[in-house]
């Protein structure tokens, strides 16, 4: 097969031009690079629900802290409880700092439990930060009158969830392990908002969810005793739930407690923001700083408080450490955790 010298020369010229553009992009200062750019703050859920709400608040303010005054828009990429978005970041998204976003932290332990199904190693992603730590619990609608100690073995409970990939499903599964016969997950809802509507209509008994989501989106539920909180998933009780038992008070086995710790460790990274693997180092530093500066912004703080959103920021470096600790959980704890999820 003969290849002309002209064709080879032309190919070399194109390659050199592409290389020059790439080098130029890498060499640009952050302010120069982001100037006039449109940045996509993505979220692995449809509009509605807690993740979307936190994403929109962050997207509203983070742009002023990114050098160059770029335009920040929200891009919803729902699917498989944000797994579709994670896979997009992993394989498709540019690594230049123009696309990053929020995903379901429950995928982190799931990636260890079911590595083939998830297909993502969260230690490889670029960690920008987390907007808060979370506190999860399971509840039933107040009219049901269910008491975890007295009624768990006698009354059937239906708990709504979006899918087995959702963060809430982890807590539903742990709760279900207390009485597999009576606690029934009902999957297939598109958003948490749809689950809560079904609960209000009497189609479901309850849900396992985040305290912050309830406080921001259903602020009357707890103060007006519209829901009964059955169990909270943490080692210590939340100040607003002093009379609700923790899962660690109900379980007695130390091995079970270690497995639960693995499953709920991602609570510390409540609203995680990540970029694609191998993001350029200077863009990583720029976005991490922009995130922390946003979290300290008085205007941001005032706006979040109006929406009753809890904020407890975690740096990208610290979030990456927690992701690494989840990934390196001892096999025996992972195996026991897997049984909880069956």
Task: Name the predicted role of every residue range.
Residues 10, 154, 293-297:
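Polar helix-capping/helix-linker motif
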Residues 35-39, 223-226, 250, 268, ...:
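An extracytoplasmic/periplasmic, membrane-proximal ligand-sensing/linker region
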Residues 1-13, 19:
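Bacterial N-terminal signal peptides that target proteins for export
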Residues 270-276:
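A short beta-strand structural signal in non-transmembrane regions
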Residues 14-15, 25:
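Cleavable N-terminal signal peptides
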Residues 46-47, 276-280:
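Structural beta->alpha junctions
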Residues 21-27:
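Sec/Tat signal peptide C-region and signal peptidase I cleavage site
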Residues 28-270, 338:
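Conserved hydrophobic/amphipathic secondary-structure segments
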């Amino acid at each position: 097969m003969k290849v002309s010298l002209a064709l080879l020369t032309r190919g070399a010229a194109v390659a050199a031009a592409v290389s020059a553009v790439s080098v130029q992009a890498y060499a640009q200062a952050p302010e120069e690079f982001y100037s006039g750019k449109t940045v996509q703050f993505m979220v692995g859920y449809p509009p509605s629900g807690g993740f979307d709400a936190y994403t929109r608040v962050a997207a509203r303010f983070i742009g002023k802290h990114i050098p160059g005054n770029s335009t920040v828009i929200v891009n919803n990429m729902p699917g498989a409880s944000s797994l579709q978005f994670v896979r997009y970041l992993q394989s498709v998204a540019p690594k230049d700092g123009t696309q990053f976003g929020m995903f379901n932290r429950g995928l982190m332990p799931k990636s260890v439990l079911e590595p083939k199904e998830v297909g993502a190693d969260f230690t490889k992603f670029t960690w920008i930060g987390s907007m808060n730590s979370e506190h999860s619990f399971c509840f039933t609608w107040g009219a049901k009158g269910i008491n975890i100690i007295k009624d768990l073995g006698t009354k059937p409970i239906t708990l709504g969830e979006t899918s087995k990939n959702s963060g809430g499903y982890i807590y539903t599964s742990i709760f279900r392990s207390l009485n597999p016969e009576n606690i029934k997950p009902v999957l297939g809802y598109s958003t948490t908002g749809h689950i809560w509507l079904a609960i209000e209509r009497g189609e479901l008994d309850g849900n396992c969810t985040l305290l912050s989501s309830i406080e921001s989106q259903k602020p009357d539920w707890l103060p007006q005793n519209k829901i009964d909180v059955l169990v909270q998933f943490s080692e210590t009780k939340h100040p607003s739930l002093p009379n609700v038992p923790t899962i660690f008070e109900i379980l007695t086995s130390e091995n079970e407690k270690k497995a639960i710790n693995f499953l709920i460790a991602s609570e510390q990274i409540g609203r995680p923001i990540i970029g694609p693997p191998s993001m350029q180092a200077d863009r990583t530093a720029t976005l991490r700083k922009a995130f922390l500066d946003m979290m300290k912004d008085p205007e941001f703080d005032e706006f979040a408080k109006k929406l009753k959103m809890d904020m407890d920021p975690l740096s990208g470096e610290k979030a990456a450490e927690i992701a690494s600790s989840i990934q390196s959980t001892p096999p025996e704890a992972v195996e026991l955790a897997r049984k909880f999820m069956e």
